[in-house]
Amino acid sequence: MAADMPDPTLQNVVDQKELKWIFVGGKGGVGKTTTSSSLAVALAESGTRNRVLIISTDPAHNLSDAFRQKFTKTPTLVNGFTNLFAMEVDPQPDIGEMEQLEWAQDSFLTELAGSIPGIDEAMSFAEVMKQVQTMDYDTIVFDTAPTGHTLRLLNFPTILEKGLSKLVALKGAMGGMMGQVTRMLGGMAGGGEGAADLPDQLLGKVEGMLDVVRKVSAQFKDPLLTTFVAVCIPEFLSLYETERLVQELAKFEIDCRNIVINQIIFPESVGGSRLLDARVRMQQKYLDQFYELYEDFHILQLPLLEEEVRGPEALKAFAVNLLKPYVPAPPTDAAARQAALVSEVAALKKRVAELEAALAKK
């Protein structure tokens, strides 16, 4: 590792007070929820934010498990904190939820929207963004689903902008004809002028949502307001997926300058086990590749832990590792003796095998 590499912590994220949106994502099973939860804790305890919100967009919703507290699609104050809130949302809405959206009450808009790929998920996401925008949060952390779902989520503003623009254009082009039909049907049904004006009212709602989407889209592309923290482990598939993620983020013009490498087995903690020694060598090979590929990134190394990180206190303790380089503790005397014993037994087995082979030749 070069001496002039960026600081190997997430302190830069905490110090950037202007940050509004922080996405945490990567391959499944690499520790995204633990990292995002701990980062949210670090932000809340930094003294630089009055209110922090963490949102899970992963259908698995591990956020409740991480904090040992049930969360819903409404922001809830996290136990043990005064300024940290959490909520769990599903970017894939069910039919009942879609029918509640204001724009969905116009059948013409609904049919048009249904012809645009991905618009249903994107509109649901826009409703969440609209809700969040009205709340007074300094920073919002997204605990995202695995990489493929995350990339689709980050593309929602673009999908929405194109889709809603089409709706507005089509509605405008056909407005006269649709207005006549609506007034006629409204009069026949006894709906009066209110029913006739409904399409225009709903179109106004769509245009208002389009304004929100454009604002969020612009913020996502502003490195002062948005950043993405990639989480991975030192293995081939995770390295490959991280590279793909970083490239896609560049296409979306979303800032990414921090990588958290999780589940590392440090040589100091091995204590002589052949299996762990082999694992350390394999991990080191991929760690070297990470540093070659991302020499201008903040790369944070986190250890493979003996226990799961669950509950507010455990997350507070783990959050310390995000803000300063992790220093592995040397093996205890008991661990060292056990490792030495394992090594001696392995050596004896090897010697016995050699003697048996020698006897077999005679």
From Swiss-Prot:
ATP binds at K27, G28, G29, V30, G31, K32, T33, T34, E235, N262. One of its GO terms (cellular component) is endoplasmic reticulum. Keywords: ATP-binding, Cytoplasm, Endoplasmic reticulum, Hydrolase, Nucleotide-binding, Transport. GO terms for molecular function: ATP binding; ATP hydrolysis activity. It is an enzyme of class 3 (hydrolase). Its EC number is 3.6.-.-. It is found in: Cytoplasm, Cytosol; Cytoplasm; Endoplasmic reticulum. The active site is at D58. InterPro entries: Anion-transp_ATPase-like_dom, ATPase_ArsA/GET3, ATPase_ArsA/GET3_euk, P-loop_NTPase. Gene3D superfamilies: P-loop containing nucleotide triphosphate hydrolases. One of its GO terms (biological process) is tail-anchored membrane protein insertion into ER membrane. ATPase required for the post-translational delivery of tail-anchored (TA) proteins to the endoplasmic reticulum. Recognizes and selectively binds the transmembrane domain of TA proteins in the cytosol. This complex then targets to the endoplasmic reticulum by membrane-bound receptors, where the tail-anchored protein is released for insertion. This process is regulated by ATP binding and hydrolysis. ATP binding drives the homodimer towards the closed dimer state, facilitating recognition of newly synthesized TA membrane proteins. ATP hydrolysis is required for insertion. PANTHER family: ARSENICAL PUMP-DRIVING ATPASE ARSENITE-TRANSLOCATING ATPASE, ATPASE GET3. Homodimer. Interacts with SEC61B. Belongs to the arsA ATPase family. This is ATPase ARSA2. It comes from Chlamydomonas reinhardtii (Chlamydomonas smithii). The gene is ARSA2.
